[in-house]
UniProtKB/Swiss-Prot annotation:
GO terms for cellular component: nucleus. It is found in: Nucleus. It comes from the Eukaryota. InterPro entries: AtrR-like (IPR050987), Transcription_factor_dom_fun (IPR007219), Zn2-C6_fun-type_DNA-bd_sf (IPR036864), Zn2Cys6_DnaBD (IPR001138). Disulfide bonds: none annotated. This is AAl-toxin cluster-specific transcription factor ALT13. It comes from Alternaria alternata. PANTHER family: HALOTOLERANCE PROTEIN 9-RELATED, TRANSCRIPTION FACTOR PDR1. The lineage of its organism: Eukaryota, Fungi, Dikarya, Ascomycota, Pezizomycotina. Transcription factor that regulates the expression of the gene cluster that mediates the biosynthesis of AAL-toxins, sphinganine-analog mycotoxins responsible for Alternaria stem canker on tomato by the tomato pathotype.
Amino acid sequence: MSTEFVFVDHQAAQASVRQKPKLSRRRGACENCKRRKVRCSGANPCEQCLKVNVHCWYIGNNQSRRRSVPNSGADKNNQQGDTDRHNGARLGLESFGHLHFFSESFLDAQSIPMDQPPGSSPVMDFDPYDYDASPLSMSNEQTALIDWDQLEATSNYVALGISANSGNNFIADQCFSETRTATNRASKDPLNGGCHNTLHTGEFTHDSRTVDELLNDSIPLAFAASTKSSLSFDYVRSSLHSWLLTAMTELDGDENRHILQTFERLLNANSPVIRHPSLNEDVNSIEILNSLRSESSQNRALVYRCIDACFSNPNRVGIFLDRMTVEELVCQVLAHPFVSSPISIALCLSFLAVGSRDLSLDDDCREMNAMNLFRTALYIRPNPSSGPSLWTFQALLLMAHFSCDIGAESTTSLMTDTATCVQALRLHSSAAISNLCSSDSERVNLKRAFWTFFAVEKLHCIQEGLFPLIHGEYADHKVAAPQDPLCRRYDCLYSDVGYAKICSKILQQLQGQQDISQVGSSCCGRESYKQSPAFTANRLETMLMEWKGNLPFDGDGKNIFTATSPGERRIRLTCINMYHFAMIAIHSLPGVEDTDASKRQRCESAREILDMSEHITSADLLYDWSVPPLCPDC
């Protein structure tokens, strides 16, 4: 049986071939995965790119965008997944809508930067839900919800675009012009190591270091306010902190904790207030800083009154600090507290605590309570082991001085931290001080700060029975003369250092480290011998009488109230109390405390102190720090 053969026409074969889809690579295929049989939709990445989690290069290289709808099931699924993630992010952000973190005038307070062309949109005008249009790169990592490195790089540029007349800016008009001038000056200053934060018109340079690393660097004694002002004047982030944390204080504990955890993820360790785990202390710090920077109250006038009270007596804070730099520091911290370093905040609050105690503002103003201010400063005090600097030394010295005067339990730990800074900075060496400072005035202030701590530490040690950590015998410089003409007539630091050296000798006898009355030597086989304890006490008493004779007034307490001014009367009162206090300590040494002469001398000194206490007023106790710890009635 024969089989019939059928021949296929050439045109029919071509028609059957055209029925199959062509899967070869066309224009617009993905350039990353190089897949020839994969079609990208143009709106979503291809399936292969999603599998390997890489960026699809289709959008940037597509030359033919004729189709705008998905052409496969995989593309539809991918688009649906992106839509779900988009809606989920929108829902997560809208869950905080009822809290009203920001004021209605947030966008109104923004203005266009100086380099932005007319007619363009403001800096902060973008859709937070539009990932492609957002200027901030979004991420799902634990602490990278916002790319703050990108924001920090543009912080100084954006800062120039924010209005200086915002309601939350404390003395903004004054500081705004000073910031740009100081920043340009700092960028050309060779003493600052070529300040990494250079700011020019139309361009900026990004510093690879963090804000904390910049703020913790070693800086001159005058705080280097001009060189660091650009870091403290981040208007956008300061307003963000202020409005959000102000709203937190109006919520209950659970909502506060939830918001604080969320905000800590957004601003990872850039704010000293949210860096610590204790929520109660965080809220307390927030309330204090917000109330101090409020323009609706009289707190600004109280702040300047506190500064005046601190420097009213040049022999107190003015011994080792400069008023002009202190005012600049306080103004910067109160203008933008939430972007300031913990060191600057602690130093500012310590100043306000001192002034509030002098003015007795505890009952008149709750925000200016001295103990609350000092407790907050103590909570965020700097750690010298993380990198000591002159700024850290100044903050710890002021806090230790204040803590010693009020008799706080934190005095010993503050003294130890301050001594650590002194050792790390080698402040006993004149050469080291010259390397740390850039001017003669800073060197003088730093030397006086060293001897101030030397005097305060010895007074605290003799009261608590501790051994000192800093010894003046190893310092190669002496007490520098004060620069203030008001202090040159009578410098209390000279008498304080002389009294501290006597206290150091007394402590040596109490601790049994060395006997200052030891005579002879162990050379040539001869053993050294010691004088009696009575001779040691007489030697110390002679040194104390010499110190009393060098005072610029009659050491006899009979004419102490004939001083021409209240300040001079208080100085005389303090020195007489210090003299009798040391006399009691000398006659309480082992070996002489049980003798009749020592008992008689202790009774006489105690009687003199009691007689002086009758004339001490409350103003004296608030004005002079040295009177309360020496007065037995206090």
